Amino acid sequence: MRKILAGVSAGTFALLYGMLVLVLLIIFELTGVPLITAVIASAIVLLIQFLISPFLTDLTQRWFYKTKFGAEMPPYLKAFIEQVCHEQNMKYPKMGFIDDGAPNAFTYGHTKNNARIVLTRGIFELLTEDEVKAVVAHELGHAIHYDMLLMTAAELVPTVLYAIARGLMEGMKSSDGDSDSSKSAAAQAIIAAVAYLLYIIAQYIVLWFSRTREYFADEYAVEATKNPEALSRALIQIGFGLSTHADTKDRKRGMSASSTNAMGIFDTKASKSLVVSCFVDGEIDKTHIKNAMKWELWNTWAKWYELNSTHPLISKRLQAIDRLAPQYGRAPFVNFDLQKPESYLDDFFREIAISIAPVIAFLAAAVVAAVLFIQERMGLLWVAAVLLIVSAVLSLLKYRFTHPANAYHEATVAGLLAEPKVSGIRSIPCELKGTIIGRGDPGCIFNEDFVLQDDTGIIFLDYNQPLFILNKIFALFRAKDNLDQTATVRGWYRRSPVPYVELYTIEAGGKTKKIFTYGVGKVLRWLYLVLAVAALAAVFML
C-alpha cells in the first residue's frame, strides 16, 4: 500500500506543479514578467494558514462546539490508539469529545505527531467497540499518511493559479491604450484565461487527490483492525447511517458525556446522514443497505456530486473494502448485486433543464432588450417583455416541481432512503415522526439544523428561514429547546448527495414552528410574474 500511496502522491504533485511551472514559463516568455511576487505571496499565505489552522480550529471547537479536549476515552479505545501509536512511532493524538447525539469523527493537525481526533457522543451510541476502533483507525490513517500536509501542498497550485489569473486581469485594467500596451494586454488576457482554466482543472485534481486519500485511509483502517466488516458497518452507520446491530438503543441509554479544515470519516458538507435499521430477527438484512446504495450507484446526480466532493461516495468505499476482505479471510460484507432497472440519465437532464430554464429565458430577455435599445427599435421591446413573462412562468413551474404542494404523506427514514429517483431538485413531500437527537452540525451553537431519529433510523433536518439572522437567533436561543423532544416534521425529502428533509413545519415540545422560506419563495415568484406583465403593459403604453 505504501508504494502505491507514494506513487499516487508523486504523480499528482508532478501533474499539479507541472501545470503551474508551464503557466509561469508562458508568462515569462510572452510578457517578461516573472510574477514571482504573486507566487511567493500565495505560498506564504497558505503556509501561514497551514501553521496556525490547527490552533484556530482548537479555539473554534472549544468556543462554538463545546469540544472537551483531553476527555477520557473508553479503555478499549485508548488501548487500541496506544498500540497504533507504538507501531507507527507517533505521539498519542489529542482527543476531543463533543456531547451531541449526531455521529461525526474527524482529524486535523500538521503531522502525525500533533494530530487531533474529535469524536461525538453519537459515535459511541451508534457503533460497537470494533466499529469505533475502525473509525478512529481511519482518522489515524490520515495522520500517519501526512494527509493534512500533503493536501495543503496540493492546494497551493490552484491558489497560485487563481492569484496569477486575478493579477493579470488587474494588470490589464491599468494598462495604457497605446499599441504596445494593447498587444501586452491581449497576451495577458490569453494567459489569464489559460491560468483560470488550469485553476479549475487543478481544483478538480485536488478533489480527486482528496478522495484518493480517503480510500487509502480506509485501507489503513482495515489493515490496523484486521476487520473490514467493522469499517463497512461504521461507514454504513455514519455515512448512510444504516444500523447494523440490534443493541443501539440499549447502548445509547448507557452512554453519557462523562464516559466518553479537518479530514473526517465522511464529507462534513455531506453530514446530512441517516441511520436505518438493518437488523431483522437477529440477523443483518442487507436489503436496506443495498437500497441505500442504489441512489449512489445508479442516479447520475450522485456522480456529479462526487466529482465536486472531497470524499468518495459511501457505496464506492464499501465496494473497495469488500475487495480487501478476502485478504483477511472475510467474505464481502455487502456484495451489491442489484440490477439497474433503467437509465437515470434522462431524469438528470430533465431536472437540469427545469432548473436552468427560467435563467435562460431571463438572459434571453436581457439580450433582446439590450440589442433593441442599441438599435433604437423600441417598438419591438414587447418581445423582451414576453420573454420575461416566460421566465416568470417557468420559475413558478420550477418551484412547483421542486416543492410539490400535494399532501405530506407519512413516511419512514428507511422508506425514503430506498427511493432512487430523488435529487436536490426533485423532492418527495413527507411527514416524519421521531425524536430530535442532536444538531445538524454536531455541537455547534450557531447551527439551526437538527437530526431526527425514528424507529428505522436518523435523518438530517434542514431548518432555513428566509433571513440568515433569523436562523442564527433560533440556533442560539431556541434550538436547544427542541433537543431530545418528540417531534413531527413536514417538508421535502431530497438527496444531494446525502439524504435530508427541507423543513416546512416542525412540531416539538408542544409547539409548532413554521419555516416561511417556501411561502416567501412562492410570493416572490408571483411578484416576478406581475412585474413582467406590468413591463409588457408599459411597452404597449409607450
Predicted regions and their residues:
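Hydrophobic or amphipathic, alpha-helical segments that drive membrane association/targeting
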Residues: 1-108, 158-207, 239-243, 315, ...
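Short pre-active-site segment immediately N-terminal to the catalytic Zn-binding motif
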Residues: 69-70, 118-134, 205
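Active-site-proximal gating segments in proteases and membrane effectors
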Residues: 87-114, 170, 175-183, 208, ...
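Active-site recognition of the HExxH zinc-binding catalytic motif
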Residues: 119, 134-142, 146, 214-218, ...
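Extended, hydrophilic extramembrane loops/domains of integral membrane proteins
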Residues: 126-127, 131-132, 140, 148-163, ...
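Short nucleic-acid-contacting surface segments enriched for D/E, G, S/T with interspersed K/R
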Residues: 423-430, 467-490
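Structural detector for short beta-strands of small beta-barrel domains
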Residues: 426-446, 488-493
